[in-house]
């Protein structure tokens, strides 16, 4: 399917038709299409596909994958959709070099992975979304989800991991101007996730040996934020003056030990990439 212009009816996104639907087929190539004002591009029980160079905007879910194993999503422009890419039970995905903008639906995300293992998310620009990246933990901890060299900026939450901690590797990503860079909710040890070589705009360390990496690890800690992390009903008050004041007091003179969200063992001093 190459070089098509696809539109749906001018109604609410849930009432529109799918711009493209694939099921029980394999080896499909969807290239350089202009798609807008649809419901979803839905791919079900269809492995080994290539989605390259497409533009999808003003829709509900740009790509909706279900059992679409070993598919490639490359160089697509996804803008003003409720969610950019959502994948359920789709192992072995490669999501690379996509630009995902303005997915600001309350429950939306730039990229959302659920019950998906052995995925590689590399070189994407994810800007101004409710959640930049959402993912649970892979079923098998050996089949990790890997995030490399992504630009994650101006999102409400940069990365949101839920479920049992572990099974994620994040290397060389840039996190800038997110309201909250990373949120991880679930049981387990936060050190079971691997973070290294990422740029954090909140890092306050030094680089005395001038190797481009901070001299000490970057620890993201939750102080008063634990209130809304552990009590979903309190998220409405996130960043309210009262919680901001409580967070300031907790950092100044902690009433209790803060919770470790993540530790980046070698934070970068400069971003690996910028937004073009």
Where are these regions (language model features)?
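Right-handed parallel beta-helix
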Residues: 1-63
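Extracellular beta-strand/beta-solenoid scaffold signature
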Residues: 13-23, 36-39, 58-64, 80-86, ...
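Functionally critical loop-and-helix segments that line ligand-binding/catalytic clefts
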Residues: 104-106, 110, 119, 132-138, ...
């Amino acid at each position: 399917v190459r070089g098509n212009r696809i539109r749906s009816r001018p109604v609410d996104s849930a009432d529109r038709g799918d711009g493209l639907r694939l099921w029980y087929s394999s080896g499909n190539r969807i290239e350089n299409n202009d798609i807008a004002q649809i419901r979803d591009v839905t791919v079900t029980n269809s492995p080994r596909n290539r989605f390259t160079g497409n533009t999808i905007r003003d829709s509900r879910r740009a790509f909706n994958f279900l059992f679409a194993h070993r598919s490639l999503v490359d160089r697509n422009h996804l803008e003003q959709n409720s969610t950019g890419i959502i994948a359920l039970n789709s192992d072995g995905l490669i999501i690379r070099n996509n630009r995902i903008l303005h997915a600001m639906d309350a429950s939306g995300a730039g990229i959302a992975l659920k019950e998906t293992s052995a995925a590689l998310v590399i070189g994407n620009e994810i800007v101004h979304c409710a959640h930049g990246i959402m993912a649970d933990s892979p079923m098998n901890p050996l089949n990790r989800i890997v995030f490399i060299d992504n630009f994650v900026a101006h999102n409400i939450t940069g990365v949101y991991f839920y479920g049992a901690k572990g099974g994620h590797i994040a290397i060389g990503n840039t996190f800038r101007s997110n309201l909250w860079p990373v949120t991880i909710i679930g049981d387990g040890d936060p050190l079971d996730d691997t973070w290294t070589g990422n740029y954090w705009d909140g890092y306050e360390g030094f680089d005395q040996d001038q190797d481009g990496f901070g001299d000490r690890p970057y620890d993201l800690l939750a102080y008063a934020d634990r209130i809304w992390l552990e009590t979903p009903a309190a998220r409405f008050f996130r960043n309210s003056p009262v919680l901001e004041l409580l967070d300031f007091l907790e950092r100044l003179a902690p009433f209790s030990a803060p919770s470790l969200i993540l530790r980046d063992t070698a934070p970068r001093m400069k971003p690996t990439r910028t937004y073009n």
